[in-house]
C-alpha cells in the first residue's frame, strides 16, 4: 500500500466531509471545496476520519492513491485554517500599491503592472514591498503567488525582483574587470 495513502485523515471539529459518488466535498468555517475522485479510488467517511483505498496494485491505482489522500487532506486544512504565501519586492523603486481588491506593481518597467486576484483569493499589502496571498485552495494560492513572482523574476546579479519570503536567490559574480 502507499505509505501516504493508507494513513487515515482526521476531520477536525467544524469541518464536514461528504462523498457523493465520485465527488468529495469538504465544508468548513472558511468555505467549501469539491474534488472529483478518479475511477479506481474509493473514499469512505466514518466517525471523524476519512479513509482512501484502492482496489488493486496496478501502477495507476498506486499513483492515484497517495495523490487523492493528499488532496483531500489539503482541502480539509484549507477550509479550516486556510493557506497563505508571502512575497517580497526587492529593488530600488520597486513597490506595490493596493487599488481596491487589485494590486498595482512598479517593477522597473515603463508602465505600472496591474494584477487582479481571481475569485477565492485575497491579496493584502504590508508596507510597499510585501504582498500576502491567502485563500482556501492550496493549489490556487500557490499558482497566484507564482504568477505575481513571474511579473519580475529575481535577478541573479543584484537580487532585484519579486521573491517568496525567505527565498534564497543564487547570486552570480559580475564580469571580472581588467
Curated annotation (Swiss-Prot):
Signal peptide: none annotated. One of its GO terms (molecular function) is structural constituent of ribosome. Keywords: Ribonucleoprotein, Ribosomal protein, RNA-binding, rRNA-binding. GO terms for biological process: cytoplasmic translation. GO terms for cellular component: cytosolic large ribosomal subunit. SUPFAM superfamilies: Ribosomal protein L6. The keyword Chaperone does not apply. It comes from the Bacteria. This protein binds to the 23S rRNA, and is important in its secondary structure. It is located near the subunit interface in the base of the L7/L12 stalk, and near the tRNA binding site of the peptidyltransferase center. Belongs to the universal ribosomal protein uL6 family. Part of the 50S ribosomal subunit. PANTHER family: 60S/50S RIBOSOMAL PROTEIN L6/L9 (PTHR11655), LARGE RIBOSOMAL SUBUNIT PROTEIN UL6M (PTHR11655:SF14). This is Large ribosomal subunit protein uL6. It comes from Kocuria rhizophila (strain ATCC 9341 / DSM 348 / NBRC 103217 / DC2201).
Amino acid at each position: 500500500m502507499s505509505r501516504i495513502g493508507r494513513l487515515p485523515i482526521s476531520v477536525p471539529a467544524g469541518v464536514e466531509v461528504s462523498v457523493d459518488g465520485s465527488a468529495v466535498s469538504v465544508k468548513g468555517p472558511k468555505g467549501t471545496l469539491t474534488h472529483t475522485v478518479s475511477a479506481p479510488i474509493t473514499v469512505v467517511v466514518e466517525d471523524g476520519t476519512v479513509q482512501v483505498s484502492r482496489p488493486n496494485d496496478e501502477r495507476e491505482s498506486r499513483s492515484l492513491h497517495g495523490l487523492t489522500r493528499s488532496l483531500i487532506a489539503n482541502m480539509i486544512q484549507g477550509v479550516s485554517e486556510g493557506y497563505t504565501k508571502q512575497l517580497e519586492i526587492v529593488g530600488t523603486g520597486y513597490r506595490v500599491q493596493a487599488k481596491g481588491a487589485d494590486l498595482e506593481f512598479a517593477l522597473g518597467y515603463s508602465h505600472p503592472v496591474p494584477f487582479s486576484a481571481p475569485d477565492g483569493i485575497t491579496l493584502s499589502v504590508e508596507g510597499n514591498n510585501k504582498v500576502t496571498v491567502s485563500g482556501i485552495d492550496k493549489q490556487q494560492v500557490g499558482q497566484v503567488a507564482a504568477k505575481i513572482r513571474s511579473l519580475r523574476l529575481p535577478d541573479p546579479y543584484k537580487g532585484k525582483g519579486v521573491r517568496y519570503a525567505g527565498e534564497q536567490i543564487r547570486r552570480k559574480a559580475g564580469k571580472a574587470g581588467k
